[in-house]
């Protein structure tokens, strides 16, 4: 299978290199178009005020296009202009840190997959529930083996399959669960600090209270040690409220 690979952690990130190696070893052809720099939490941002520049990375058996832009830039430019062949599947990841519940609104990883889906490609987002530097080569091999089992023929157009791996050894994973997103939200705050020169700055912090996470949702099952699989469709229309607002029509 020909696969286009991207991420938001950057083209040199361990997660991308791990899944690249695993996909190649599984017999796939992999074309990489990923950001040159760290782009976590940029969401679906697109570069419009400056040109996009591309750097080719070719080292130790790895080859890919590095884009000085966002994950969405990578997909728009890569799928329309850089890649010689259309992929059969787009994979975004493996991200350092889970993308569950409200995380998908901020995630460059999920946004890259979403952009690919909107362009008519089958797309998967892969994430690992830890920010610590860890060897996730076994998880990458597991993911490479899991992807061919997705039954795309039965899925609607522009669907993104969002897959998250728990931060446990592969042999300790309890299984795979297809589940909805949690509706729990982040409780954010900013820490006010002072730099060595006396200047003020603010640092974002936050937590999702565990008691607000409903059982059977992606965050709950991921914490329990399951791989979570959640299909995403980016239609933000609140269909239930449409009729309630009908009185505004003239």
Swiss-Prot record:
<protein>
    <recommendedName>
        <fullName>5'-nucleotidase SurE</fullName>
        <ecNumber>3.1.3.5</ecNumber>
    </recommendedName>
</protein>
<feature type="binding site">
    <location>
        <position position="8"/>
    </location>
    <ligand>
        <name>a divalent metal cation</name>
    </ligand>
</feature>
<keyword id="KW-0378">Hydrolase</keyword>
<dbReference type="InterPro" id="IPR030048">
    <property type="entry name" value="SurE"/>
</dbReference>
<dbReference type="InterPro" id="IPR002828">
    <property type="entry name" value="SurE-like_Pase/nucleotidase"/>
</dbReference>
<feature type="binding site">
    <location>
        <position position="9"/>
    </location>
    <ligand>
        <name>a divalent metal cation</name>
    </ligand>
</feature>
<dbReference type="GO" id="GO:0008253">
    <property type="term" value="F:5'-nucleotidase activity"/>
</dbReference>
<comment type="similarity">
    <text>Belongs to the SurE nucleotidase family.</text>
</comment>
<comment type="function">
    <text>Nucleotidase that shows phosphatase activity on nucleoside 5'-monophosphates.</text>
</comment>
<dbReference type="GO" id="GO:0046872">
    <property type="term" value="F:metal ion binding"/>
</dbReference>
<dbReference type="InterPro" id="IPR036523">
    <property type="entry name" value="SurE-like_sf"/>
</dbReference>
<keyword id="KW-0963">Cytoplasm</keyword>
<keyword id="KW-0547">Nucleotide-binding</keyword>
<dbReference type="GO" id="GO:0005737">
    <property type="term" value="C:cytoplasm"/>
</dbReference>
<dbReference type="Pfam" id="PF01975">
    <property type="entry name" value="SurE"/>
</dbReference>
<keyword id="KW-0479">Metal-binding</keyword>
<feature type="binding site">
    <location>
        <position position="40"/>
    </location>
    <ligand>
        <name>a divalent metal cation</name>
    </ligand>
</feature>
<dbReference type="GO" id="GO:0000166">
    <property type="term" value="F:nucleotide binding"/>
</dbReference>
<feature type="binding site">
    <location>
        <position position="95"/>
    </location>
    <ligand>
        <name>a divalent metal cation</name>
    </ligand>
</feature>
């Amino acid at each position: 299978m020909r696969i286009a690979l991207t991420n938001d952690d950057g083209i040199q990130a361990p997660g991308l290199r791990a899944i690249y190696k695993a996909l190649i070893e599984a017999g796939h052809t992999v074309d990489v178009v990923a950001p040159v720099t760290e782009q976590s939490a940029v969401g679906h941002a697109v570069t419009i005020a400056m040109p996009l520049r591309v750097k080719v990375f070719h080292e130790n058996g790895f080859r890919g296009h590095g884009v000085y832009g966002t994950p969405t830039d990578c997909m728009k430019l890569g799928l329309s202009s850089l890649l010689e062949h259309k992929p059969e599947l787009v994979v975004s990841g493996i991200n350092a840190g889970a993308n569950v519940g409200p995380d998908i609104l901020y995630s460059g990883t999920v946004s890259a997959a979403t952009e690919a889906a909107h362009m008519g490609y089958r797309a998967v987002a892969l994430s690992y529930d830890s920010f610590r530097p860890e060897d996730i080569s076994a998880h990458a091999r597991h993911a490479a083996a899991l992807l061919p089992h997705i039954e795309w023929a039965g899925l609607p157009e522009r669907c993104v399959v969002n897959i998250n791996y728990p931060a446990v050894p592969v042999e300790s994973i309890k299984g795979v669960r297809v589940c909805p997103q949690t509706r729990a939200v982040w409780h954010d705050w900013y820490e006010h600090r002072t730099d060595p020169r006396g200047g003020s700055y603010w640092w974002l912090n936050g937590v999702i209270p565990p008691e607000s996470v409903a059982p059977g949702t992606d965050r709950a099952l991921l914490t329990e040690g399951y791989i979570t699989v959640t299909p995403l469709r980016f239609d933000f229309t609140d269909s239930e409220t449409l009729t309630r607002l009908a009185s505004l029509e003239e």
